[in-house]
C-alpha cells in the first residue's frame, strides 16, 4: 500500500493535481504542483 505523496482531501486546491488515491480511501490524493 503506497502512501500518498501529497495530502488526502475531498477536493484538490488550485495548485494541486489529483493522483492515484493510494491509501486515501474515499478521498483524493492531491499532490502540489510547482508554479513559477
Swiss-Prot record:
GO biological process: defense response to bacterium
Tissue expression pattern: Detected in egg white (at protein level).
Keyword Transit peptide: no
GO CC annotation, single: extracellular region
Disulfide bonds: 4-30, 8-29, 12-24
Keywords, ordered alphabetically: Antibiotic, Antimicrobial, Defensin, Disulfide bond, Pyrrolidone carboxylic acid, Secreted
Localization terms from the record: Secreted
Superkingdom of the organism of origin: Eukaryota
List of residues that carry Pyrrolidone carboxylic acid: 1
Function field: Antibacterial and antiviral peptide. Has strong inhibitory activity towards E.coli and S.typhimurium. Has significant antiviral activity against Chandipura virus.
Family membership: Belongs to the beta-defensin family.
Subunit relationships: Monomer.
Protein name: Defensin-like turtle egg white protein TEWP
Organism: Caretta caretta
The organism's taxonomic lineage, starting at the top: Eukaryota, Metazoa, Chordata, Craniata, Vertebrata
